[in-house]
């Protein structure tokens, strides 16, 4: 498996492009860089059966968001308010920031 430079980060707002949750928008909770996947809030939710423990004596069925491949996600631009491709630009002080390819606005806060 190749290591890709992921442009998706935690707390980003993304839109799902394919699959059962196509068109939904959610916030990235966790990025799994080695597997090229991301866990997105309320996307690809699975029902997990938890056995009773001391912390949770009743156990039961819990909804848990599962990882989605990053190729199926697109970052939402705050100024365009649509899913966009992302580029990287280096500022004069040497800092690298993510920019929107359609409006050239900075995505990083």
UniProtKB/Swiss-Prot annotation:
CDD domains in alphabetical order: KOW_RPL26
Cited PROSITE patterns: RIBOSOMAL_L24
Pfam families: KOW, ribosomal_L24
GO molecular function, one term: rRNA binding
InterPro entries associated with the record: KOW (IPR005824), Rib_uL2_dom2 (IPR014722), Ribosomal_uL24 (IPR003256), Ribosomal_uL24_CS (IPR005825), Ribosomal_uL24_KOW (IPR041988), Translation_prot_SH3-like_sf (IPR008991)
Keywords: Ribonucleoprotein, Ribosomal protein, RNA-binding, rRNA-binding
Family that this chain belongs to: Belongs to the universal ribosomal protein uL24 family.
HAMAP family xref list: Ribosomal_uL24_B
Protein name per UniProt: Large ribosomal subunit protein uL24
Organism: Desulforapulum autotrophicum (strain ATCC 43914 / DSM 3382 / VKM B-1955 / HRM2)
């Amino acid at each position: 498996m190749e290591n890709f430079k992921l442009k998706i980060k935690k707390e980003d707002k993304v839109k799902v492009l394919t699959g059962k949750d196509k068109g939904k928008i959610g916030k990235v909770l966790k990025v799994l860089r080695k597997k090229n996947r991301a866990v997105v809030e309320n996307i690809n939710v699975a029902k997990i059966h938890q056995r009773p423990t001391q912390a949770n004596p009743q156990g039961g069925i819990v909804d848990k968001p599962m990882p989605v491949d990053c190729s199926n996600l697109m970052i939402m631009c705050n100024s365009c308010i649509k899913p966009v491709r992302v580029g990287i630009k280096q500022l004069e002080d040497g800092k690298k920031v993510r920019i929107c390819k359609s409006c050239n606005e900075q995505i990083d806060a």
